C-alpha cells in the first residue's frame, strides 16, 4: 500500500546552500524530518543551479520518511538576473527600473514552462511579462 502523506512543507532555499539553520531547520524539525538528510540531498540535487532560489515541496509521510520536488526558480528572480538589477521598483506604475527584451522573456518562459499553468509558450510569455511590469520593468521588442 502507498505511504500516506502526513504533511507538505513548502520552502524557497538558495540552491546548494540548505543548512540546518533557520528558516530550513525549524520548518523541517516541526515536520519531524531528518534535517541533515534533507540538506545533503537538496544541496546535491541543486549544486548545478548555484545562486538561484529554488522552491521545494517536501512530502512528509506518516513514518517520518520524506521526498521532495524541486521547482524552477521564481519568475521574479529570473527577471532580476536577466535585467541585471538587485530589486524591482517600489512604485512600478511610476518608476521603471529596468528593461527586458521579448527574447529574454521567451527564454524565461521556456525555463518556467513546466511549473506554469499555461497551454502554450505565448501564454507563458504573457504571464512573465505581467510579472515584469509589476516589478517596474519595461518589456521591449
Swiss-Prot record:
Keyword terms: Methylation, Ribonucleoprotein, Ribosomal protein, RNA-binding, rRNA-binding
Post-translational modification note: One or more lysine residues are methylated.
Keyword Isomerase: no
Classification via PROSITE patterns: RIBOSOMAL_L11
GO function terms (MF aspect): large ribosomal subunit rRNA binding; structural constituent of ribosome
Listed GO biological process terms: translation
Any one GO CC term of the record: cytosolic large ribosomal subunit
SUPFAM superfamilies noted in UniProt: Ribosomal L11/L12e N-terminal domain (SSF54747), Ribosomal protein L11, C-terminal domain (SSF46906)
Gene3D superfamilies: Ribosomal protein L11, C-terminal domain, Ribosomal protein L11/L12, N-terminal domain
HAMAP family, per the entry: Ribosomal_uL11
Description of how the protein assembles with itself and partners: Part of the ribosomal stalk of the 50S ribosomal subunit. Interacts with L10 and the large rRNA to form the base of the stalk. L10 forms an elongated spine to which L12 dimers bind in a sequential fashion forming a multimeric L10(L12)X complex.
Functional summary from the UniProt entry: Forms part of the ribosomal stalk which helps the ribosome interact with GTP-bound translation factors.
Family listed: Belongs to the universal ribosomal protein uL11 family.
Name assigned to this protein: Large ribosomal subunit protein uL11
Annotated organism of origin: Streptococcus equi subsp. zooepidemicus (strain MGCS10565)
